[in-house]
């Protein structure tokens, strides 16, 4: 069926994630199973909804059969009343999109209508969502690190392809050990809640030092990270990893695991050890221990920085933009976003 036929035949229902019946949860998992992405999972949606009000899921059905799920959120009751939505998890989320059965396609305007939305601003929509009929205007690169043969084999390949980078990393690692003691790495920190509190504090201090917008300033966002840290689901599991040199904390990372992939989300390192490249050493340790954890990929999310390219084995693309239906609310949303972007550019 083409987009128009599907749009006219589809029925929709807007529900809170916790109200989605087991049959719906199972269908969601089945749709996501061919390529599990933690940020598109039902478990992620439920965890966010436990801390953030006004999270909704649009359940799309065809002849009474679920064919797609579209999670999103409202920033406030005012935005909900005006039909102005945003991607689930806001600006901190690494992925956004429609979870649907194979072959399902829908135009963005129809998806908004069925979801009761006038407009929706989004980032991190993967380009493969074009197969669903969805797209955006702005394009941004992202990077994968794939190591199907395990971490040591990956590092040997890195030695051959970028000898200077590999040798420099190993030199800094040896210098760190000489200065502070042997390295100890925990893929799953034994005190996840306490370690996450420290990571959040250190990450917020990093944002202040660098002048970057603090996405952890919101108490709801911090609570969401803790909820995700407690989440243990095949398509979304919280993972907090730490590395020490002797008794000195070197670096930590909190991310989400989906099947054999780890979403590299919130890394932070000890600023007093910056000359040792602690972030690089942490990532190397995670890769070296990945095979024992059943991991074969690290997803670095959107962004094309040198630090991401250093480890990258392949590139993919995201897009962002503003979906709209005609109306006053959508026009006001567009103007508001333009003002917000202008204010941020002046900071």
Q: What are these language model-derived features?
A:
Residues 1, 33, 103, 148, ...:
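Residue-level marker of positions within ordered structural domains that often coincide
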Residues 11-63, 67-85, 125-130, 134-142, ...:
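A conserved beta-strand-loop-helix scaffold within acyl/acetyltransferase catalytic domains
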Residues 55, 62, 77-141, 256-316:
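Acyl-donor binding region in acyl/amide transferases
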């Amino acid at each position: 069926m083409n987009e128009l036929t599907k749009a006219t035949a589809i029925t929709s229902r807007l529900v809170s994630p916790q109200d989605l019946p087991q049959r719906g949860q199972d269908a969601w998992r089945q749709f996501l199973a061919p390529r599990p992405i933690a940020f598109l999972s039902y478990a992620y949606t439920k965890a966010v909804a436990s801390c953030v009000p006004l999270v909704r899921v649009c359940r799309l059905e065809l002849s009474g059969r679920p064919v797609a799920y579209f999670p999103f959120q409202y920033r406030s009751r005012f935005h909900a009343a005006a039909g102005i939505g945003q991607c689930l998890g806001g600006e901190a989320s690494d992925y956004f999109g429609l979870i649907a059965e194979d072959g399902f396609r829908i135009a963005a305007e129809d998806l908004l209508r069925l979801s009761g939305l006038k407009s929706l601003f989004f980032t991190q929509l993967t380009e493969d969502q074009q197969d669903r009929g969805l797209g955006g205007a702005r394009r941004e690169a992202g990077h994968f690190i794939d190591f199907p043969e395990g971490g040591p084999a990956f590092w040997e390949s890195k030695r051959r392809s970028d000898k200077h980078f590999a040798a420099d990393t190993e030199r800094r690692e040896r210098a760190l050990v000489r200065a502070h003691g042997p390295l100890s790495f925990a893929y799953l920190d034994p005190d996840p809640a306490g370690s996450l509190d420290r990571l959040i504090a250190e990450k917020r201090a990093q944002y202040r030092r660098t002048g970057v917008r603090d996405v952890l300033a919101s108490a709801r966002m911090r609570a969401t990270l803790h909820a995700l840290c407690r989440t243990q689901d095949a398509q979304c599991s919280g993972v907090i990893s730490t590395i020490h040199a002797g008794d000195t904390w070197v670096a930590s990372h909190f991310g989400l695991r989906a099947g054999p992939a780890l979403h590299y989300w919130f890394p932070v390192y000890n600023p007093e050890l910056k000359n040792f490249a602690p972030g690089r050493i942490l990532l190397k340790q995670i890769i070296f221990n990945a095979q024992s954890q059943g991991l074969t990929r690290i997803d670095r999310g959107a962004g094309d920085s040198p630090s991401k390219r250093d480890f990258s084995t392949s590139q993919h693309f995201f897009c962002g933009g503003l979906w709209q239906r005609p109306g006053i609310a959508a026009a006001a949303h567009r103007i508001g976003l333009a003002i917000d972007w202008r204010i941020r550019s002046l900071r």
